C-alpha cells in the first residue's frame, strides 16, 4: 500500500479522496497548502516510499499556497499525482499554460478518450468521468504525455520518467466510472520502479 501525503488545496472533494484512498488500505496524511513547503518536505523525508498527491481546489495554481513551490522542488524526487487544480499546477510547472476552458462543466459526467497505457490500462474507452472545472491546461510541453482528452481538451497527462501525472477530472467522484480502480492503477504506476 502507498504512503501518501495529500496536499489539501481547501476543497470539498479532499476528504472524498482521503476516504477512497484509506478504504483501499493506503496511509494518508493531510496538510493544507497554507503551511510552508519546508514542513511538508520534512514530513515526506520521514515517509517510506512517499507519494505526493495534489488535491482539487478553487482558483488558479499560482494562488494555491505552497503547491507551486513543492512542484518545483520535488518534481523528479518522488511520485506526484495531481487532481483538477493539482493537474493544472503540474501543467504549469512543466511550462504549459492554464486558461479558461471553452466548455465549463461543474458536476457533469463526460466521456474521455485515453491511450490505454499506464494508469488507463484495461479501462473502458471512452471512460465516463466527473468534471468540475472552468480552467484547462494547454500548450502541453514535450516532457508530458497527453494520455486522455475530451474532444480537444486535455484531461490527463503523465511523465513516465519522473512519475508525475495529473487528471483534470475527479477520479474520487461517484460520477467517475471505475474511479477507485483508476486511483489504484495510478498509484501502482507511480510506485513502479
From Swiss-Prot:
InterPro entries the UniProt entry points to: Anth_synth/Amidotransfase, Class_I_gatase-like, GATASE, TrpG/PapA_dom
One of the record's GO cellular component terms: cytosol
UniProt binding sites for L-glutamine: 57-59, 88, 134-135
GO biological process, one term: phenazine biosynthetic process
The Glutamine amidotransferase type-1 domain, residue ranges: 3-193
Subunit structure: Heterotetramer consisting of two non-identical subunits: a beta subunit (TrpG) and a large alpha subunit (TrpE).
Active-site residues, Swiss-Prot/TrEMBL: 84 (nucleophile), 170 (for gatase activity), 172 (for gatase activity)
Keywords: Amino-acid biosynthesis, Aromatic amino acid biosynthesis, Glutamine amidotransferase, Lyase, Tryptophan biosynthesis
Described purpose of this protein according to its UniProt entry: Part of a heterotetrameric complex that catalyzes the two-step biosynthesis of anthranilate, an intermediate in the biosynthesis of L-tryptophan. In the first step, the glutamine-binding beta subunit (TrpG) of anthranilate synthase (AS) provides the glutamine amidotransferase activity which generates ammonia as a substrate that, along with chorismate, is used in the second step, catalyzed by the large alpha subunit of AS (TrpE) to produce anthranilate. In the absence of TrpG, TrpE can synthesize anthranilate directly from chorismate and high concentrations of ammonia.
GO MF annotation terms: anthranilate phosphoribosyltransferase activity; anthranilate synthase activity
Gene name of this polypeptide: trpG
Keyword Lyase (UniProt): yes
Catalytic activity of the protein: chorismate + L-glutamine = anthranilate + pyruvate + L-glutamate + H(+)
CDD domains: GATase1_Anthranilate_Synthase
Protein's pathway: Amino-acid biosynthesis; L-tryptophan biosynthesis; L-tryptophan from chorismate: step 1/5
Keyword Cytoplasm among UniProt keywords: no
Pfam families associated with the record: GATase (PF00117)
The enzyme's E.C. designation: 4.1.3.27
Official protein name in the record: Anthranilate synthase component 2
Amino acid at each position: 500500500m502507498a504512503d501518501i501525503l495529500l496536499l489539501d488545496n481547501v476543497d470539498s472533494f479532499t476528504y472524498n479522496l482521503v476516504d477512497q484512498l484509506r478504504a483501499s488500505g493506503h496511509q494518508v496524511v493531510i496538510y493544507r497548502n497554507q503551511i510552508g513547503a519546508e514542513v511538508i518536505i520534512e514530513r515526506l523525508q520521514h515517509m517510506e516510499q512517499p507519494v505526493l498527491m495534489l488535491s482539487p481546489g478553487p482558483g488558479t495554481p499560482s494562488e494555491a499556497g505552497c503547491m507551486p513551490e513543492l512542484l518545483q522542488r520535488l518534481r523528479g524526487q518522488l511520485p506526484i499525482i495531481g487532481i483538477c487544480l493539482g493537474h493544472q499546477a503540474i501543467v504549469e510547472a512543466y511550462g504549459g499554460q492554464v486558461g479558461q476552458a471553452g466548455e465549463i462543466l461543474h458536476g457533469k459526467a463526460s466521456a474521455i478518450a485515453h491511450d490505454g497505457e499506464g494508469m488507463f490500462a484495461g479501462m473502458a474507452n471512452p471512460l465516463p468521468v466527473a468534471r468540475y472545472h472552468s480552467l484547462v491546461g494547454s500548450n502541453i510541453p514535450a516532457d508530458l504525455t497527453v494520455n486522455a482528452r475530451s474532444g480537444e481538451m486535455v484531461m490527463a497527462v503523465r511523465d513516465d520518467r519522473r512519475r508525475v501525472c495529473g487528471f483534470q477530472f475527479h477520479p474520487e467522484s461517484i460520477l467517475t466510472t471505475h474511479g477507485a480502480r483508476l486511483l489504484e492503477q495510478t498509484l501502482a504506476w507511480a510506485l513502479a520502479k
